């Protein structure tokens, strides 16, 4: 029987590098894991206001730099749902699993129009060594364009 997960310690968080930006500036939103053990994938949707922010691109975060892990990720916005960014991040099985804490992805947005955009996860899961969903606290954020 597997050991029970330490549920409260695992957290998936959205953390913008700044909470307020001017129109035309880029804001980077870190997707961070805290207290991860044997994580193999992190699929999620990120909801945002497309009138305030425009998705620009996604890159691996500093928590993955200097590790032997081989991340594979896809990120795209469906033109029919402009405020819905679908992201899939997984690690090549032979390269190991993610353990620890830190920003695993950085998602860049262009500040388009004045206003406030909630940034929240939808259908987010953190998956363990056998692709089982792990119990995790999921925390969103906001961004303001002035």
Where are these regions (language model features)?
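Acidic, low-complexity intrinsically disordered segments
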Residues: 1-146
């Amino acid at each position: 029987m597997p050991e029970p997960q330490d549920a409260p310690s695992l957290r998936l968080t959205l953390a913008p590098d700044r909470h307020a930006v001017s129109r035309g500036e880029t804001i980077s939103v870190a997707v961070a894991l805290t207290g991860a053990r044997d994580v193999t994938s992190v699929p999620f949707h990120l909801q945002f206001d497309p009138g305030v922010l425009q998705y620009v691109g996604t890159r691996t975060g500093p928590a993955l730099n200097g590790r032997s892990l081989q991340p594979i990720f896809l990120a795209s916005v469906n033109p029919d749902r402009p405020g819905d960014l679908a992201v899939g991040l997984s690690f090549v099985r032979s390269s190991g699993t993610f353990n620890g804490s830190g920003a695993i992805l950085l998602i860049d947005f262009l500040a388009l129009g004045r206003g406030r955009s909630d940034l929240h996860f939808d259908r987010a899961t953190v998956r363990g060594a056998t692709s089982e969903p792990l119990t995790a606290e999921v925390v969103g954020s906001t961004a303001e364009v002035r």
